[in-house]
Amino acid sequence: AKTGILDSDGPTVAGNSLSGT
């Protein structure tokens, strides 16, 4: 996952991905 971006690892929360990094 990437900061500030929705990706396959999960949605972002407070600028950080919900799962993964």
Swiss-Prot record:
Where is it located? Secreted; Nematocyst
Q: Which GO terms describe its cellular component?
A: extracellular region; nematocyst
- Which parts of the sequence are annotated with region: Disordered? 1-21
* Keyword terms: Nematocyst, Neurotoxin, Secreted, Toxin
- Does the UniProt entry include the keyword Nuclease? no
Q: Which domain of life is it from?
A: Eukaryota
Record has Nucleus as a keyword: no
In the record, which residues are listed under signal peptide?
none
* MF terms in GO: toxin activity
Main subcellular location: secreted
Cystine pairs annotated here are: none
The role this protein plays is:
Injection into mice produces severe neurotoxic effects such as circular movements, aggressive behavior, dyspnea, tonic-clonic convulsion and death.
Please give the name of this protein: Granulitoxin
